[in-house]
Every structure is written in structure tokens, then in C-alpha cells.
């Protein structure tokens, strides 16, 4: 059984987490709590019954220039365009292939939609670390940047339609 995403806190057990990508595992174990404390990003975790983290994602505010954005994304927007960055998203190897990553993207999308009621946001942006990750994000509705195929974006309107 896996919990619904909740904000990372000191009671969560991070050490056993292993998604298969060292840099993503290490970010959770070494940076996530520091970023949570300083406000640099917010991390949301799903745990097993023992508080071991089994999946996570992080969100941060940012902006993207219009020339790096797909046409629909930049239409009628200022330069730079306000966005939320889906900074990290990972699932423990024990849960790969069970739809957890897709559920995390949905949860992140719902949070972004909620925040957009208070502050201006055009959508969500992600930097894919691999071709496999890029293909996943495209399957869940993200569109690649015309300048960098590993930077993908989804508009707020598309998020609303997909969640």
C-alpha cells in the first residue's frame, strides 16, 4: 500500500529509496529536505506503511523565455513566461510499471492548478533527464520546446483538461 502524496518532513525515511538513477536518488537524500526548509522547492512524497519514501516529486517556481516555448504556450504571454517547474519525479524500482509516475504527474498538475488561482502561472515545465523520461512526459501531455527537446511544457488549460 502506498500513501497519497504529502509534503516531505523529517519523519520520512529516505535512505532505502532507489529509482535506478543515482542523481535522482541522491537529490532526494541530500537536497530535498534542505530545499524544503529554505523554500527553494517543495517536495511531495508517497510512502509505504513504514514511512519509507516510495515515490516523490518536487515543484518550484520559475520562468521561461518565449523563444524557448512552443507556440501555444507562449501565445499572449509576457517574456519571461511564469511557470512551475516539475523539478524531480521518481518512483522506487519496486513500483515501476504500476502507474505511480502518471499519478504523481496528475497530483502535481492539481497542485499547480490550485496555485494558479492565486498567482499567475502559464503552465508546468519539466527538464527530462533521458529519452525515456522525455517520451513519458510526452505521453502525459507535455510538449517539447522548439529549442531543446528535453525541456517540455504543458499549459494550465491542458492541465485542467487532463486531470
UniProtKB/Swiss-Prot annotation:
Supply the EC number(s): 2.3.1.-
Give the matching Pfam families.
Acetyltransf_7
What does the free-text pH dependence field read?
A: Optimum pH is 6.5-7.5.
**Enzyme kind, highest EC tier:** transferase
What reaction does this catalyse?
Answer: glycyl-tRNA(Gly) + acetyl-CoA = N-acetylglycyl-tRNA(Gly) + CoA + H(+); L-isoleucyl-tRNA(Ile) + acetyl-CoA = N-acetyl-L-isoleucyl-tRNA(Ile) + CoA + H(+); L-leucyl-tRNA(Leu) + acetyl-CoA = N-acetyl-L-leucyl-tRNA(Leu) + CoA + H(+)
Q: Which UniProt keywords apply?
A: Acyltransferase, Repressor, RNA-binding, Toxin-antitoxin system, Transcription, Transcription regulation, Transferase, Translation regulation, tRNA-binding
Q: Which InterPro entries match?
A: Acyl_CoA_acyltransferase (IPR016181), GNAT_dom (IPR000182)
**Listed SUPFAM superfamilies:** Acyl-CoA N-acyltransferases (Nat)
Query: Where is coiled-coil annotated?
Result: none
Q: Tell me one GO molecular function of this protein.
A: acyltransferase activity, transferring groups other than amino-acyl groups
Enzyme active site: 137
Can you tell which superkingdom this protein's organism belongs to?
Bacteria
Q: Which PANTHER family match?
A: ACETYLTRANSFERASE, ACETYLTRANSFERASE-RELATED
The subunit structure is: Homodimer. Forms a complex with cognate antitoxin TacA2.
Question: Main role?
Answer: Toxic component of a type II toxin-antitoxin (TA) system. Acetylates tRNA and inhibits translation. Acetylates mainly Gly and Ile/Leu in vitro. Overexpression during the lag phase of a tacA2-tacT2 deletion strain leads to a 100-fold increase in persister cells in the presence of cefotaxime and a non-growth state in the absence of antibiotic. This protein, which has a single amino acid compared to S.typhimurium strain 14028s (Lys-29 is Glu in 14028s), produces 100-fold more persister cells, has much higher acetylation activity and binds tRNA much better.
Q: What else is known?
A: There are 3 TacA-TacT systems in this strain.
Q: Which family does it belong to?
A: Belongs to the acetyltransferase family. GNAT subfamily.
Put simply, this protein is called tRNA-acetylating toxin 2
Amino acid at each position: 500500500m502506498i500513501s497519497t502524496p504529502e509534503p516531505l518532513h523529517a519523519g520520512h525515511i529516505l535512505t532505502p529509496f532507489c529509482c535506478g538513477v543515482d542523481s535522482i536518488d541522491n537529490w532526494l537524500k541530500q537536497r530535498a529536505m534542505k530545499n524544503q526548509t529554505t523554500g527553494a522547492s517543495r517536495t511531495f512524497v508517497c510512502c509505504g506503511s513504514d514511512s519509507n519514501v516510495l515515490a516523490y516529486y518536487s515543484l518550484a517556481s520559475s520562468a521561461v523565455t518565449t523563444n524557448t516555448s512552443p507556440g501555444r504556450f507562449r501565445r499572449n504571454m509576457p517574456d519571461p513566461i511564469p511557470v512551475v517547474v516539475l523539478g524531480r519525479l521518481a518512483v522506487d524500482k519496486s513500483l515501476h510499471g504500476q502507474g505511480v509516475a502518471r499519478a504523481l504527474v496528475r497530483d502535481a498538475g492539481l497542485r499547480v492548478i490550485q496555485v494558479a488561482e492565486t498567482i499567475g502561472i502559464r503552465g508546468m515545465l519539466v527538464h527530462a533527464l533521458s529519452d525515456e523520461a522525455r517520451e513519458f512526459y510526452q505521453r502525459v501531455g507535455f510538449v517539447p520546446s522548439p529549442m531543446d527537446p528535453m525541456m517540455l511544457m504543458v499549459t494550465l488549460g491542458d492541465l485542467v483538461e487532463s486531470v
